[in-house]
Amino acid sequence: MKANDIRDLSTTEIQDQEKALKEELFNLRFQLATGQLENTARIREVRKAIARMKTIVRERELA
């Protein structure tokens, strides 16, 4: 998800999306450990999306 798309969401929606991505990251890491993960790049994408969301929430707190 792009940063501009995230900025269009409300803070609670961002936090809900972040929670869902954290669950997905957990599942991806579990799949990686068991050797079932095919697309290892997805872990990086999810981590970066979580970071973008946290950054935007923090920007709103400071504004």
Curated annotation (Swiss-Prot):
UniProtKB keywords: Ribonucleoprotein, Ribosomal protein
UniProt record, GO biological process: translation
UniProt xrefs under PROSITE patterns: RIBOSOMAL_L29
Presence of the UniProt keyword tRNA processing in the record: no
Pfam families registered for this protein in UniProt: Ribosomal_L29
Protein name (record): Large ribosomal subunit protein uL29
Cellular component GO terms held in the UniProt record: cytosolic large ribosomal subunit
InterPro entries from the UniProt entry: Ribosomal_protein_uL29, Ribosomal_uL29, Ribosomal_uL29_CS, Ribosomal_uL29_sf
Family: Belongs to the universal ribosomal protein uL29 family.
Ribosomal protein as UniProt keyword: yes
SUPFAM superfamilies assigned to the protein according to its UniProt record, in alphabetical order: Ribosomal protein L29 (L29p) (SSF46561)
Molecular functions (GO terms): structural constituent of ribosome
